[in-house]
Design a protein with these regions (language model features):
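Extended, solvent-exposed, non-transmembrane regions
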Residues: 23, 28-53
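Short, surface-exposed tryptophan/glycine-enriched loops
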Residues: 99-109
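Short, surface-exposed beta-strand/strand-loop-strand elements in extracellular ectodomains
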Residues: 74-99
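Short beta-strands within extracellular/lumenal beta-sheet-rich domains
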Residues: 43-67, 97-101, 132-133
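Short beta-strand-plus-loop segments that form exposed binding edges in beta-rich domains
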Residues: 112-131
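Extracellular beta-strand elements of beta-rich domains used
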Residues: 71, 134-136
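Extracellular carbohydrate-recognition regions
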Residues: 1-31
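Short proline/glycine-enriched turn/loop motifs at strand-loop junctions of beta-rich domains
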Residues: 65-68, 75-81, 107
Length: 139
């Protein structure tokens, strides 16, 4: 389709991420910026095995100079996976066993918030939520 946006898959290694403090890490790549902030949560964002880990009450901000209409996070380990919400647009239906979290809308910036409890994770005990992702595809 002529004029259609081309999907860009962002992958990374842990050393590509930078941080202004332990409570905030960011990645700038291919015209996009991802910022993960601890906010009121108990744990700082963490990178392990090139997977980003955002914990309960953290935010994941995706931004660009150009509008985008779709974001898909490829999930890592879903042990304590929680509900993910967005400040604009719509997050796709989430369920236990998911391998991705999707968003649709029209924006230059979206802020995702990590839920408090492990609503959809494989851990049956009620624990603090996590959002672990290993790549992001944006268009």
């Amino acid at each position: 389709e002529e004029g259609a946006a081309v999907a860009v898959e962002l992958t990374w290694t842990a050393n590509e991420w930078t941080g202004s403090s332990p409570a905030e890490v960011s990645l700038e790549k291919d015209g996009y910026k991802i910022v993960v902030k601890k906010n009121s949560g108990s744990h700082n964002p963490y990178l392990k095995d090139d997977e980003v880990r955002a914990y309960a009450n953290a935010t994941v901000e995706v931004s660009s100079d150009n509008e985008f209409s779709s974001i898909v996070f490829a999930l890592g380990d879903t042990f304590q996976y929680s509900e993910i919400t967005a400040d604009t647009g719509e997050v796709g239906t989430q369920a236990k066993g998911d391998t991705q979290v999707s968003w649709s809308g029209s924006s230059k910036k979206v802020v995702f918030t990590v839920g408090e409890a492990n609503t959809y994770g494989s851990n049956s005990e009620k624990k603090n939520g996590q959002f672990r992702f290993k790549s992001v595809t944006i268009k």
